[in-house]
C-alpha cells in the first residue's frame, strides 16, 4: 500500500494533535502506540517528524513566537499550532524542500483551520525560510 507524503503529513498532524490532547488531559500513552493506531504501515518519515516535534517542541515554539506579532503559539487553536510546529520542524530538520513544507502546511491549514490561522502559518513559515 503506497501512501503519499501529503497523506502521511495529515497522519502526523493527527498523531501530534492526539498527543497534545493526551498531554493536556494528563493521559498516559506511548508515542509508538499512537503512531500504530493512526497508520498501519511503517514509516520512518512519520516517526522522524513525530518524535522530532515532541523532542524539540520548546525550540519550535520559541521559533514561532519570534515571528508571531502580538501573539504566541499557545493562542492558536490546537490544530493550527500542531501544523505550525510540524512544518517548522520539517523546514529546519529534514531535507524536504522548504517550498514543499510550506505548501503542505498551507493545504492542511486550509482543510483544518480558519483563514486567519492559515495566513498566520504562511507568514511565520515564510519569515523562517527567509531569515
Model-derived regions: residue spans:
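N-terminal interaction/assembly modules
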Residues: 1-131
